[in-house]
Amino acid sequence: MGETLGDSLIDPESDAFDTLSANISQEVTMVDTEMPFWPTNFGISSVDLSVMDDHSHSFDIKPFTTVDFSSISTPHYEDIPFPRADPMVADYKYDLKLQDYQSAIKVEPVSPPYYSEKTQLYNKPHEEPSNSLMAIECRVCGDKASGFHYGVHACEGCKGFFRRTIRLKLIYDRCDLNCRIHKKSRNKCQYCRFQKCLAVGMSHNAIRFGRMPQAEKEKLLAEISSDIDQLNPESADLRALAKHLYDSYIKSFPLTKAKARAILTGKTTDKSPFVIYDMNSLMMGEDKIKFKHITPLQEQSKEVAIRIFQGCQFRSVEAVQEITEYAKNIPGFVNLDLNDQVTLLKYGVHEIIYTMLASLMNKDGVLISEGQGFMTREFLKSLRKPFGDFMEPKFEFAVKFNALELDDSDLAIFIAVIILSGDRPGLLNVKPIEDIQDNLLQALELQLKLNHPESSQLFAKLLQKMTDLRQIVTEHVQLLQVIKKTETDMSLHPLLQEIYKDLY
């Protein structure tokens, strides 16, 4: 690992660069094969497993030959998402039932995204939305709400008034004047104030839920969005951009966070994932799970750690193509210099893979094979070194990243921001890249304010994760260098060789 960021530039005079640039605009058909278990579910087309055994593609890392950033030069924008068949439906049965791991597949669900009906895309100058517009009002008196209390947004005063009334079982003198309750008058008529609390939906039982009901959230967001659009028309353009990216995201990535979370929480009509926690359950899983990239008779003679590692490689290759397809739908991306498009994808794909991998993880394990299986964290750690070290940093990142409680609409913009990073080594024309990213950052900031009004620091926290992701990729490349030295019979997929070449 002697290279630095400055050493990792792509030589525009080299044959490798010519091959890379040629392949970026030409679809390369790859042979579909089978693989073991890749704990992500977003991808590129498959490549024959026999390539993995071809030692001409070993860790000696040959020149660029097979990058499949296909058809990047053809933009296509669609404002209406196309429904996809759910890839997780299978015609097999799961027999293994483990009480020890039932609790592992339980996490908090993620609320679906909210968007307005506007879909036109614009590129307007940035104007910061007024902070006052983002202040949510108390549903009872109109004062600034301090949070979601007893089922509605309420200020501290009305929250305390309602709590005292309920706990002390207070009964107020009846008033038939239907007094108006607002910030200055709320203490004048306790009867009408309590009736207003009940009328807007405050309930002592609602405290246990802790989260805003989705219908209430959508109504509130609609009110806020309408106010913002009237005073700041540019925000409507940013939300339209966010909707476009979300639609493209849904079409590009089969297993979304919403689907993954539904599986992990048992809130899906599909069968529960088969739990793989040791060698015996792994063997049973190979019989029960429809693995997409493995031919069992050919592969069972290989060591388990190597088979899983090869499966991860193939799933990564699939990921590159889906990320590439998504990138082509980011407004302005296909108009960039072709060489810069290659560079942005080369440096960005693995950061995005690990971002989306977090959606499939909880602290105990990860979904595999399009949600058909669940491989435990402890089993992955038990693989012999250095293979047992590969996934642990991803789990550590996922636990912290998932604590931000992002949904797919947030992730759609975030991964676009990752792709359009103007500080990647070797870029030829940085200015247009930074202009696109600036627009995406504005859309992300507004999206987070609308979708997470209670998390004022979320935007800053999310940007910090971009630094964490780069560190994870650097450590991953370092582990690959260890494998290169210790596993002389191992081979690395040709496409991944090209991406990893001179990468950090």
UniProtKB/Swiss-Prot annotation:
Pfam families: Hormone_recep, PPARgamma_N, zf-C4. One of its GO terms (biological process) is positive regulation of DNA-templated transcription. The modification Phosphoserine is found at residue 111. It comes from the Eukaryota. GO terms for molecular function: chromatin binding; DNA-binding transcription factor activity; E-box binding; nuclear receptor activity; transcription cis-regulatory region binding; zinc ion binding. Highest expression in adipose tissue and lower in spleen. Very low levels in kidney, intestine, lung and muscle. Keywords: Activator, Biological rhythms, Cytoplasm, DNA-binding, Isopeptide bond, Metal-binding, Nucleus, Phosphoprotein, Receptor, Transcription, Transcription regulation, Ubl conjugation, Zinc, Zinc-finger. PROSITE patterns: NR_LBD, NUCLEAR_REC_DBD_1, NUCLEAR_REC_DBD_2. Residues 135-209 bind DNA. Residues 204-279 are annotated as: Interaction with FAM120B. The 9aaTAD motif is a transactivation domain present in a large number of yeast and animal transcription factors. This is Peroxisome proliferator-activated receptor gamma. It comes from Sus scrofa (Pig). The gene is PPARG.
